[in-house]
Amino acid sequence: MDWQKITEKMCDFIQEKVKNSQSQGVVLGLSGGIDSALVATLCKRALKENVFALLMPTQISNKANLEDALRLCADLNLEYKIIEIQSILDAFIKQSENTTLVSLGNFAARIRMSLLYDYSALKNSLVIGTSNKSELLLGYGTIYGDLACAFNPIGSLYKSEIYTLAKYLNLHENFIKKAPSADLWENQSDEADLGFSYAKIDEGLKALETNDEKLLRTLDPSLIAMLKNRMQKNTFKGKMPEILEI
């Protein structure tokens, strides 16, 4: 892949979306993970200014992620704001009858979405997405949470390709070396949740996408079963609500 051309195409896409919407710029959630770090870097290259980052940790968020996010803001000279969302989450815990880790993780993602759109309106800017193709195909995200955005420049790149582009753009090694995590609860790991590494997941997704039967026969049947199950079960997350036509 020609990463220079891909970078230029992504930057053009960001510029076009902001211009066509008559917005001032973009707002993004900066978690300290590689996906949002890459999007922030692309936004800075594309827009130079009017890139606003929200850092929204909870009490159990990995402190190293916040430090990495702050370092990136300094390196890119980004305007940012830290909003601790634990008090909002605590209010939910007091009222809700469903306080499983998954439920709390989903609610935290929706708190962040609400804040992003609030600042989007305040700054006349677009919320830019940070989900990669692997996550989108699997529905590995919170509907109306981290999946919510006005547009997404990296949604056509598999997670393994995100790492390649991040290296090409010289992102700090901390982003590249850390284990993938949505940081929804303490010690949460994407690959542990999914049961396979992203390298294997992407290999399976590509084989399914191209219907490469020869490759599919060589892959772990449990991997393919997991991928098909998640893709089928979570298809609704990538669609607008269906409206009955009268």
UniProtKB/Swiss-Prot annotation:
Residues annotated to bind deamido-NAD(+): 110
Listed pathway(s): Cofactor biosynthesis; NAD(+) biosynthesis; NAD(+) from deamido-NAD(+) (ammonia route): step 1/1
Binding, Mg(2+): 35, 135
The reaction(s) this protein catalyses: deamido-NAD(+) + NH4(+) + ATP = AMP + diphosphate + NAD(+) + H(+)
An annotated GO cellular component: cytoplasm
Keyword Transit peptide: no
InterPro entries found in the cross-reference section: NAD/GMP_synthase, NAD_synthase, NH(3)-dep_NAD(+)_synth, Rossmann-like_a/b/a_fold
Record GO biological process: NAD biosynthetic process
Signal sequence region: none
Keywords linked to the UniProt accession: ATP-binding, Ligase, Magnesium, Metal-binding, NAD, Nucleotide-binding
Residues binding ATP, per UniProt: 29-36, 130, 159, 181
Protein origin, superkingdom: Bacteria
EC number(s) stated in the UniProt entry for this protein: 6.3.1.5
Entry's Gene Ontology molecular function annotations: ATP binding; glutaminase activity; metal ion binding; NAD+ synthase (glutamine-hydrolyzing) activity; NAD+ synthase activity
Pfam families (alphabetical): NAD_synthase
Quaternary structure note: Homodimer.
Family of this protein: Belongs to the NAD synthetase family.
Role played: Catalyzes the ATP-dependent amidation of deamido-NAD to form NAD. Uses ammonia as a nitrogen source.
UniProt protein name: NH(3)-dependent NAD(+) synthetase
Organism annotation: Campylobacter jejuni subsp. jejuni serotype O:6 (strain 81116 / NCTC 11828)
